[in-house]
């Protein structure tokens, strides 16, 4: 099984995840040892939780697709997914509001991630 591209994206996403988790841990030492807290800690907790919800299954689908011969597709899919995750993270941490007008980075990051996951899921099925 040749999954070098997926391994690259898995490594890059894991490094980002460790960084986000570390930032959350630092915020937790200032606010609350248990729970999501408020303000900065709440935002950082949501970023880590959301990342953990979206990334693992996407990487599994990417591995299946790459193993099936879609190497070029995986490169593009991984890049777009990484950009969407960065946008979502930026939107939660640095922009206020929820809707597309108030927080475009979060909206584009979330909707882009959903769309890419749906595309990967359909490609796995067919």
Predicted feature descriptions by range:
Residues 62-84:
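Short alpha-helical packing/oligomerization segments
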Residues 49-62, 113-117:
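Core segments of transmembrane alpha-helices
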Residues 89-115:
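Interfacial loop-to-transmembrane junctions
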Residues 2-19, 71-79:
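Alpha-helical transmembrane segments
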Residues 119-126:
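Juxtamembrane boundary at the C-terminal end of a transmembrane helix
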Residues 10, 41-55:
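A loop-to-helix transmembrane entry motif
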Residues 22-46:
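Cytosolic, membrane-interface loops and tails of multi-pass inner-membrane proteins
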Residues 13-30, 82-92:
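Transmembrane alpha-helical segments that form the membrane-embedded catalytic/substrate-channel core
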């Amino acid at each position: 099984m040749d999954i070098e591209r997926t391994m690259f994206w898995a490594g890059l996403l894991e490094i980002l995840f460790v960084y986000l988790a570390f930032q959350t841990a630092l915020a937790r030492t200032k606010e609350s040892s248990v729970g999501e807290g408020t303000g900065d800690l709440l935002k950082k907790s949501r970023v880590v939780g959301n990342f953990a919800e979206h990334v693992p299954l996407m990487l599994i689908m990417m591995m299946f697709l790459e193993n099936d011969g879609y190497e070029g597709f995986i490169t593009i899919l991984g890049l777009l997914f990484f950009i969407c995750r960065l946008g979502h993270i930026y939107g939660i941490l640095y922009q206020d509001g929820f809707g597309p007008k108030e927080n475009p980075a979060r909206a584009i990051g979330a909707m882009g991630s959903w769309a890419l996951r749906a595309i990967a899921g359909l490609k796995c099925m067919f």
